Amino acid sequence: MTTVPVTDIQNDLITEFSEDNYPSNKNYEITLRQMSILTHVNNVVDREHNAAVVSSPEEISSQLNEDLFPDDDSPATIIERVQPHTTIIDDTPPPTFRRELLISEQRQQREKRFNITVSKNAEAIMESRSMISSMPTQTPSLGVVYDKDKRIQMLEDEVVNLRNQRSNTKSSDNLDNFTRILFGKTPYKSTEVNKRIAIVNYANLNGSPLSVEDLDVCSEDEIDRIYKTIKQYHESRKRKIIVTNVIIIVINIIEQALLKLGFEEIKGLSTDITSEIIDVEIGDDCDAVASKLGIGNSPVLNIVLFILKIFVKRIKII
């Protein structure tokens, strides 16, 4: 393919070319459409130039003048000079402004070349002979500017930094809220954070790995509903514990009475029946009985029954 030197590139076109006769532009490419257009224009200019060189209008006009207007040495009359019966047809296209402009541009473009000298350190690029002012001497590679892997890595690093900043900020806020709760300076915020801490504590008691940061995705309404549900379950559990303690005390008394009557086989019954077994077997029934009897979450009653249960297990009442 004929080399097509490019003298000027518009800003809206691609500024990347192949490395044909461009030793410093190894990363540049040209589109197929642009290459086909440049090739077509170059071929047209070459054909017109070759046609103009073979038979120029000046040669044809000089030949016609020599034949039609004889010299002084020729005979006096034109009749004496025998002319061949030929017809001269000038099929060369007349010189036009566009054709002359293309020829002159091609001649100028062939004379203009970049002599680029690259230093040993590849830092300085000097332009020795150039009359083209619109093309930059060094064009940055778009592949380096828009490196996909590098951009993804930078975005990932930025996300990690933002997460670290967010976690540090939230940790300081949680610590500040905890100190305010401890010293009772802000009742509203202490109540709000107490709900979250109560939820986390309840989850930890049940073996669930939940933290305060995990509750940040929940709205305040959701926190309120979760806290109310836990509170209702906690009150129900307290009522069941009260009924369970009463059942354990009654079983211990019955066991001692049966042992007093001579039933040795009943020994060890109280140790087999625990609070967990009662909760699994008749836990819901205990809650229903407590609700029907109107037994509420009474801390005093719960403490008294707990102490009484311990003493009944150790002391023989009957």
From Swiss-Prot:
Residues 145-172 form a coiled coil. Signal peptide: none annotated. InterPro entries: Poxvirus_A11 (IPR007755). One of its GO terms (cellular component) is host cell cytoplasm. Phosphorylated by a OPG054-independent mechanism. Its main location: host cell. It is found in: Host cytoplasm. Induction: Expressed in the late phase of the viral replicative cycle. Keywords: Coiled coil, Host cytoplasm, Late protein, Phosphoprotein. The keyword Phosphoprotein applies. Disulfide bonds: none annotated. Homomultimer. Interacts with OPG160. Required for viral crescent formation early during virus morphogenesis. Belongs to the orthopoxvirus OPG137 family. This is Protein OPG137. The gene is OPG137.
